[in-house]
Amino acid sequence: MNYVEFFNEYKKPVEELDLLKDFINYAFEKLQLKNVMFNVIIVDNESIHKINKEYRNIDRETDVITFALEDNKQIDVPGLRVLGDVYISYDRVISQAKDYGHSTKREICFLGVHGLLHLLGYDHMTKEDEIKMFGLQKELLYRYGFK
């Protein structure tokens, strides 16, 4: 069994949260993940800016930040693979959906799976890694029903 906790720390209700939960569970199934646990925290631009500055020394907002915990030996839950936390800026969900010409539903699911893949060890630092990671994201979104 997989466990994902969703925390809405945004200033308003996030109507796409149930869809994101369903999509993450879909991704678990397609990626054949079992017994994993992680958190998704929805925040605003101000909050993610502070996190980005404090932990990455980058003085600007971003769309998604992940904190991998799997290698942290102090976090041990028997029978579970504890992956970490995914922070998503809902302000960026809104602005990027508009910029890219698609729905906020697609954008929040994109950022959710992007964060999950980072926690699983995927990255996009090289062109080869970027093609692999973004290809997998695109495939999951497409098969779920996003065009």
Locate the predicted segments by residue.
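An acidic/histidine-cluster motif and surrounding catalytic segment
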Residues: 1-109, 120-147
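Periplasmic solute-binding protein
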Residues: 117
